Amino acid sequence: MVALAEGVKRRLTMQTVEIADSTTAIRSLDWDRDRFDIEFGLQNGTTYNSFIIQGEKIALIDTSHEKFRQLYLDTLTEQIDPTQLDYLIVSHTEPDHSGLVKDILALAPDVTVVGSKVAIQFLENWVHQPFKQLIVKNGDTLDLGNGHVLEFVIAPNLHWPDTIFTYDAKTQILYTCDAFGMHYCDDHTFDEDLELLEEDFKYYYDCLMGPNARSVLSALKRMSQLPAITTIATGHGPLLHHYVTELTGRYRQWSEEQAKAETTVAVFYLSDYGYSDRLSQAIAHGITKTGVAVEMMDLRWADPQEVRELVSIASGLVIGTPPIAGEVAQKAQTAISTILAAANAKQSVGVFESGAEDSESVYLLANKFRDLGLTPAFPPILIKETPT
């Protein structure tokens, strides 16, 4: 474990490393960050990793946290002329990776933004300006020239619903954003010392990936259909190169153990809405500690059939309060109605406030399930101040 002397503050720093042919990692090193969302205390800071691939065309994979804005943009412009950027690949839209998308669009107005359908929809609502876009599906490819043919892997719920992986056939690098990462900040670009990293690797899995074990297994199955993977370029922490087989094997083992649990709890939340996603992760992490499997689903993008299927296999339900008005209210309320219709009196239920001003009353939502005969798993969770 990297220890920081008491009272000593490390700066936000940048690191650029050529990790393969015409491929550069831009790593934003956040030495002192001690918390990542509510449930995720950090001992060793974190990094936000971004990548440039230069073929005949140039692609940038992910950006950085907005706290690195000027440092990151200065570093990027030292590597390339942003106006020459052809593609911006958004692995997912969580702000720590997409926080500078607007800045990239300002520097490179002709860039094409590449992402899943859900990611592009989210960016349209966030950016509020027209931009060139390319929606990709599983198995789609993008040829940058000079052998850099990118193949996209859809990996929803790792750990956001819009996640994609990107595989470069020439360098055999798989870019996975959050998956297979860890919150660990030091100057080593790669996973040179497994013993030093494995505690943080497991803790990261438990907090973020364990609640989505079945999604992990689905992603691993899709990864197995790719050619050889020599490096996994993660969004946080060191890149995996020396221990790719070992560490992906651990993900498989842990996820299979989690998926075999006899009891499943379904956790329904709303991404980018109040504290819904953060609280749902904290609750899900706590549930997995008891040996119970968790399946998480985002009400913003939930398909009614998928909602029904998940409710039908779950012994317990946890739901964050949805909005009663606004852009996503209708879809979220439809999902809630589907949950209510599919739920049965043998199930337990818990509800929590999302912390947004326009959200439904937590008591009103709880009463709807109580009227159906479901047993409260815990008292409604109220938010009286910013969760920490």
Question: In which residue ranges do the predicted regions lie?
Answer:
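Metallo-beta-lactamase
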Residues: 7, 11, 17-21, 115-163, ...
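Active-site metal-binding motif and surrounding structural segment of the metallo-beta-lactamase
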Residues: 56, 67-114
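FMN-binding flavodoxin-like domain, especially the glycine-rich phosphate-binding loop
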Residues: 184-190, 196-232, 237-239, 282-297, ...
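Active-site neighborhood of phospho(di)ester-bond hydrolases with catalytic His/Asp-centered motifs
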Residues: 61-63, 85-93, 113-116, 174-177, ...
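Conserved beta-strand hairpin/beta-sheet module of binuclear metal-dependent hydrolase folds
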Residues: 16-78, 165-168, 172-175, 276
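Short, charged N-terminal beta->alpha structural module
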Residues: 268-290
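Metal-dependent phosphodiesterase/nuclease catalytic metal-binding core
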Residues: 52, 165-203, 209-231, 241-269
